[in-house]
Amino acid sequence: ALSPLEADYPHTYLLDKEAHNGLLFYSRYPIREVQERYFCQDHVPSLTVDMDLDGREVRLYCIHPRPPRPRDDTQHLDDELMIVADELREQHRPAMVIGDFNEVGWSWMVKEFKQHAGLCDPKRGRGLYNSYGAQNPFLAWPLDHAFVTDDFRLLGIHRLRPCGSDHYPMLYRFQLTPA
């Protein structure tokens, strides 16, 4: 079903999992390295992708922690975000963190993560961009996020039409600013 993307996004990486958390990554830009990572739970994968954009190395974190269940502790999400934030503070290259955080952008943990990592929220001041709840738009929440270092300029954000998932597809367009 996704094979039409391969013409425009020839660089791909597939982490095929029997469980609910397989990951598929498509890119227009060459991929240098992909790390499959299990930050806090051995059955919940994330990807760290190093790519070349116009001769510059960019790091991309693709995260999707397991959704919380009633009476669940969210410590795994908190820990995963803070591990990524610590890494971002130590590295000095353009970076993005994208994914289904299973947390709204105004939650204490997401605010703490952005501040600790030194990331910008491109949605700030532009609207909620509810991404979860495609089956019932009246109960939608902004759970999918893209946070970036200040090396990127936002060109646009769009919530796309539902495509069969419980999440709306989100399209973020960024431009890497000159070094």
Task: Briefly describe each language-model feature range.
Residues 1-179:
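Soluble catalytic domains of enzymes that build or remodel membrane lipids, polysaccharides, and related
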